[in-house]
Amino acid sequence: MDKLVILKSIGGNFERGFQCSLSIATEGQPIDLKVLGALPAHHSLPEDYRTWQATCRNLGLRSRISGSGTVRKGATRSDCVRASEHLQEQLNRWLQSPSFVPIRDKLQEQLQPRDRVRLVLQVDDLALQQLPWHAWELLDRYHNIEIALASPTYQAVKQSPPCPKPMRVLAILGDASGIDIETDRVKS
């Protein structure tokens, strides 16, 4: 069965935490249920993300002396893997917070491993968007899941009215070699 799951953060930041809502619907149908929960403050998670990014960005760079005279070493693959594992561990620990349990429980209750799931994360906090949501351990049991980011605010786009007459296309194909077309260009 195709399911649409919308996880929305309602304001907040990593200093204060995030209020969240979860909506689940069968694809093409109205929302079946809505659950509220919260993610607590987690000051170090954005820094863990930046550390992982910086470590992997420096992957394979040679040691070099910076302007201050200190030697900076490039990161190794194992440094990058360690930073990635640490970030994933912190993310999953955060997503197991007691205040987020109602959302986790409802996901496990409503979704079956064989379901095709579209998980839409409606978040406005850039740092929250950048987290590796695909590494959420809860999602490992769903083999047919897509994760998408979306803005929590949106407006429907009006469709253009259809053309009253069918469109006609004229295409002239040819080769101008050997023909003096300069006089035609000047006249038009």
Regions found by a protein language model. Give the residues of each.
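Non-catalytic, solvent-exposed interaction/assembly segments
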Residues: 1-167, 172
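Active-site metal-binding loops of divalent metal-dependent hydrolases
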Residues: 174-176
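Glycine-rich phosphate/diphosphate-binding loop of Rossmann-like nucleotide-binding domains
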Residues: 178-180
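Short helix-loop-beta junction
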Residues: 185-188
